[in-house]
Amino acid sequence: MATFSLTSTLPSSSPTTSLHSIPKPKLKPSTINFTHNLNPFNPNLKPSRHHYLSNYGPYVKAIALDFSGSFFEGGFGGLDEDPPSTPPAGLAVEEKPEPQCPPGLRQYETMAVLRPDMTEDERLTLTQKYEELLVAGGAMYVEVFNRGVIPLAYSIKRKNKAGETNNYLDGIYLLFTYFTKPESISPLEAALVTDDDVIRSSSFKIRKRKY
């Protein structure tokens, strides 16, 4: 029989049985293969000091640049060190003894407001001129403080010797402190009033408070 001989030549096991009988390879989870590529994690491991500085170095450096000129200038010496306790620039009070008033002299202050468009050389020349004028009048312990350009409380019109009128909204403030004779104030005020570089000036005597 043709049908009998054909079936006798086929394998004894059916196709379904042969597929199930093939052993399947045991695959490891992908997470296991991934963890093999990582370094073992140690929960007690702490970042080293070098690692901390490398991550935060640019941030600390930016603070030092932003606060250049203040008590942050130069940054901190180290992360374990406290920031310097020096007060901000402009607020530090230098402890020095106040000069005693010489006999026959009085303590005065003169505030002079200069043209805001003066150059630095012009300002220094004017400052030296009035310092010499004060010393020639018998003044002692002359000190000058440059307050910089400050807006005026109100605009000031001033005519110079050439007949030109200027309207000033701000000026360079100079403060003179000194000891001198009372009669030397009038020549100083006369020189300031006639100076084209001086917008406004005022001199007054310092009175000590009595407690």
From Swiss-Prot:
Self-association and partners: Component of the chloroplast small ribosomal subunit (SSU). Mature 70S chloroplast ribosomes of higher plants consist of a small (30S) and a large (50S) subunit. The 30S small subunit contains 1 molecule of ribosomal RNA (16S rRNA) and 24 different proteins. The 50S large subunit contains 3 rRNA molecules (23S, 5S and 4.5S rRNA) and 33 different proteins.
Note: 5 different forms exist, S6 alpha, S6 beta, S6 gamma, S6 delta and S6 epsilon, possibly due to different transit peptide cleavage.
Family: Belongs to the bacterial ribosomal protein bS6 family.
HAMAP family: Ribosomal_bS6 (MF_00360)
GO biological process, one term: translation
Keyword Plastid: yes
Protein name (database record): Small ribosomal subunit protein bS6c alpha
Function: Component of the chloroplast ribosome (chloro-ribosome), a dedicated translation machinery responsible for the synthesis of chloroplast genome-encoded proteins, including proteins of the transcription and translation machinery and components of the photosynthetic apparatus.
Residue stretches in coiled coil: none
